[in-house]
Curated annotation (Swiss-Prot):
GO biological process per UniProt: flagellated sperm motility
Native species: Bos taurus (Bovine)
Annotated segments matching region Disordered: 1-37, 151-170
Subunit structure: Microtubule inner protein component of sperm flagellar doublet microtubules.
InterPro entries: CFAP276
Keywords: Cell projection, Cilium, Cytoplasm, Cytoskeleton, Flagellum
Cytoplasm among keywords: yes
Protein name: Cilia- and flagella-associated protein 276
Disulfide bonds: none
Length: 170
Protein backbone atom coordinates (compact mmCIF):
# COMPACT_ATOMS: atom_id res chain seq x y z
CA UNK A 1 0.00 0.00 0.00
CA UNK A 2 1.57 3.33 -1.02
CA UNK A 3 2.13 5.95 1.66
CA UNK A 4 0.62 8.75 -0.46
CA UNK A 5 -2.88 7.25 -0.63
CA UNK A 6 -5.51 8.76 1.71
CA UNK A 7 -7.60 5.91 3.20
CA UNK A 8 -10.44 8.33 4.11
CA UNK A 9 -10.72 10.06 0.80
CA UNK A 10 -13.65 12.51 0.51
CA UNK A 11 -15.09 13.46 -2.86
CA UNK A 12 -14.06 16.89 -4.09
CA UNK A 13 -16.87 19.41 -3.74
CA UNK A 14 -17.32 21.21 -7.03
CA UNK A 15 -19.79 23.87 -8.02
CA UNK A 16 -22.36 23.29 -10.71
CA UNK A 17 -20.68 25.83 -12.97
CA UNK A 18 -17.45 23.84 -13.12
CA UNK A 19 -19.27 20.91 -14.73
CA UNK A 20 -20.93 23.10 -17.37
CA UNK A 21 -17.79 24.89 -18.43
CA UNK A 22 -18.99 28.48 -18.17
CA UNK A 23 -21.25 30.19 -15.69
CA UNK A 24 -24.86 30.84 -16.59
CA UNK A 25 -26.41 34.27 -16.35
CA UNK A 26 -29.26 34.58 -13.87
CA UNK A 27 -32.72 34.79 -15.46
CA UNK A 28 -34.14 36.56 -12.41
CA UNK A 29 -34.28 40.32 -12.73
CA UNK A 30 -33.18 42.41 -9.74
CA UNK A 31 -35.90 44.13 -7.73
CA UNK A 32 -36.82 47.67 -8.73
CA UNK A 33 -36.97 49.07 -5.19
CA UNK A 34 -35.00 48.20 -2.08
CA UNK A 35 -36.84 46.18 0.55
CA UNK A 36 -37.51 49.00 3.00
CA UNK A 37 -39.20 51.08 0.27
CA UNK A 38 -41.12 48.18 -1.26
CA UNK A 39 -42.70 47.36 2.12
CA UNK A 40 -44.34 50.80 2.20
CA UNK A 41 -46.23 50.17 -1.05
CA UNK A 42 -49.35 48.13 -1.73
CA UNK A 43 -50.08 45.27 -1.02
CA UNK A 44 -47.26 44.92 1.51
CA UNK A 45 -48.24 48.03 3.47
CA UNK A 46 -51.84 46.84 3.85
CA UNK A 47 -50.78 43.31 4.81
CA UNK A 48 -48.30 44.42 7.45
CA UNK A 49 -50.51 47.13 8.98
CA UNK A 50 -53.70 45.04 9.31
CA UNK A 51 -53.55 42.88 12.45
CA UNK A 52 -54.71 39.29 12.35
CA UNK A 53 -57.04 37.79 14.95
CA UNK A 54 -54.12 35.95 16.51
CA UNK A 55 -51.95 39.06 16.77
CA UNK A 56 -54.87 41.01 18.26
CA UNK A 57 -55.41 38.30 20.89
CA UNK A 58 -51.71 38.46 21.81
CA UNK A 59 -52.09 42.16 22.57
CA UNK A 60 -51.93 42.98 26.26
CA UNK A 61 -55.09 45.09 26.14
CA UNK A 62 -57.24 42.54 24.32
CA UNK A 63 -60.22 41.40 26.38
CA UNK A 64 -62.85 38.97 25.19
CA UNK A 65 -65.04 37.46 27.88
CA UNK A 66 -66.27 34.57 25.77
CA UNK A 67 -62.90 32.93 25.11
CA UNK A 68 -63.21 29.14 25.60
CA UNK A 69 -61.41 28.00 28.72
CA UNK A 70 -61.20 24.30 27.92
CA UNK A 71 -62.18 21.82 25.22
CA UNK A 72 -65.80 21.68 26.37
CA UNK A 73 -66.16 25.45 26.16
CA UNK A 74 -64.47 25.37 22.77
CA UNK A 75 -66.96 22.82 21.48
CA UNK A 76 -69.96 24.60 22.98
CA UNK A 77 -68.89 27.87 21.39
CA UNK A 78 -68.57 26.23 17.98
CA UNK A 79 -71.29 26.59 15.40
CA UNK A 80 -72.81 23.24 14.54
CA UNK A 81 -76.01 22.50 12.70
CA UNK A 82 -77.27 19.02 13.57
CA UNK A 83 -79.34 18.83 10.40
CA UNK A 84 -76.59 19.57 7.89
CA UNK A 85 -73.47 18.74 9.90
CA UNK A 86 -73.92 14.99 10.22
CA UNK A 87 -70.81 12.83 9.68
CA UNK A 88 -68.39 15.73 9.27
CA UNK A 89 -64.86 15.60 10.58
CA UNK A 90 -63.60 17.61 13.55
CA UNK A 91 -62.08 20.43 11.52
CA UNK A 92 -65.37 21.06 9.71
CA UNK A 93 -67.54 20.90 12.84
CA UNK A 94 -65.54 23.21 15.10
CA UNK A 95 -66.12 26.47 13.25
CA UNK A 96 -66.20 29.59 15.39
CA UNK A 97 -67.81 32.98 14.84
CA UNK A 98 -64.42 34.60 14.20
CA UNK A 99 -63.82 32.30 11.26
CA UNK A 100 -67.07 33.27 9.58
CA UNK A 101 -67.51 36.92 10.55
CA UNK A 102 -65.69 39.93 9.16
CA UNK A 103 -63.09 40.75 11.81
CA UNK A 104 -61.59 43.88 10.26
CA UNK A 105 -63.65 46.13 12.51
CA UNK A 106 -62.84 44.44 15.84
CA UNK A 107 -61.60 47.07 18.27
CA UNK A 108 -59.18 46.45 21.11
CA UNK A 109 -60.62 47.38 24.50
CA UNK A 110 -58.22 49.42 26.60
CA UNK A 111 -58.49 49.53 30.43
CA UNK A 112 -61.23 51.91 31.55
CA UNK A 113 -62.75 52.05 28.07
CA UNK A 114 -66.21 50.65 27.49
CA UNK A 115 -67.02 49.34 24.05
CA UNK A 116 -70.62 49.18 22.86
CA UNK A 117 -72.14 45.75 23.22
CA UNK A 118 -72.11 43.76 19.98
CA UNK A 119 -75.44 43.21 18.32
CA UNK A 120 -76.93 39.82 19.16
CA UNK A 121 -77.11 37.32 16.32
CA UNK A 122 -80.35 37.00 14.46
CA UNK A 123 -82.66 34.53 16.17
CA UNK A 124 -85.37 32.71 14.30
CA UNK A 125 -88.90 32.72 15.60
CA UNK A 126 -89.26 30.72 18.81
CA UNK A 127 -92.99 30.32 18.22
CA UNK A 128 -92.37 27.13 16.24
CA UNK A 129 -90.22 25.49 18.95
CA UNK A 130 -92.17 23.09 21.15
CA UNK A 131 -90.90 22.32 24.63
CA UNK A 132 -92.34 19.31 26.45
CA UNK A 133 -92.37 19.14 30.24
CA UNK A 134 -93.15 15.84 31.93
CA UNK A 135 -96.05 16.41 34.36
CA UNK A 136 -94.83 13.61 36.64
CA UNK A 137 -91.41 13.85 38.25
CA UNK A 138 -89.61 10.54 37.65
CA UNK A 139 -87.20 9.25 40.27
CA UNK A 140 -83.65 8.74 39.10
CA UNK A 141 -83.48 5.64 41.33
CA UNK A 142 -86.44 3.93 39.66
CA UNK A 143 -85.67 1.04 37.32
CA UNK A 144 -88.95 1.53 35.47
CA UNK A 145 -88.26 2.57 31.89
CA UNK A 146 -84.57 1.76 32.09
CA UNK A 147 -82.66 0.12 29.27
CA UNK A 148 -83.13 -3.65 29.29
CA UNK A 149 -79.95 -5.59 30.00
CA UNK A 150 -79.07 -9.02 31.41
CA UNK A 151 -78.15 -7.37 34.72
CA UNK A 152 -80.08 -5.32 37.21
CA UNK A 153 -78.73 -2.75 39.63
CA UNK A 154 -81.60 -3.28 42.09
CA UNK A 155 -79.47 -5.36 44.48
CA UNK A 156 -77.06 -4.07 47.06
CA UNK A 157 -73.33 -4.16 46.47
CA UNK A 158 -73.22 -4.84 42.75
CA UNK A 159 -75.02 -6.53 39.93
CA UNK A 160 -76.95 -9.78 40.06
CA UNK A 161 -77.71 -12.20 37.27
CA UNK A 162 -81.15 -12.27 35.71
CA UNK A 163 -83.10 -15.44 35.11
CA UNK A 164 -82.40 -15.44 31.38
CA UNK A 165 -78.64 -15.72 31.93
CA UNK A 166 -75.77 -13.46 31.08
CA UNK A 167 -72.53 -12.54 32.78
CA UNK A 168 -72.13 -10.26 35.72
CA UNK A 169 -69.33 -8.34 37.34
CA UNK A 170 -68.89 -7.05 40.86
Amino acid sequence: MPLTRDPFQNPALDKDDSYLGKSRASKKLPYKNPTHLAQQQEPWCRLSSTPTITSMKRDGFFFYSEIPKDDLDFRLAALYNHHTGTFKNKSEILTHQETIQDTRRIKTQFPGEFLPAPQPPLITSRANIRHWINPKKESIHSIQGSIVSPHTAATNGGYSRKNDGGFFST
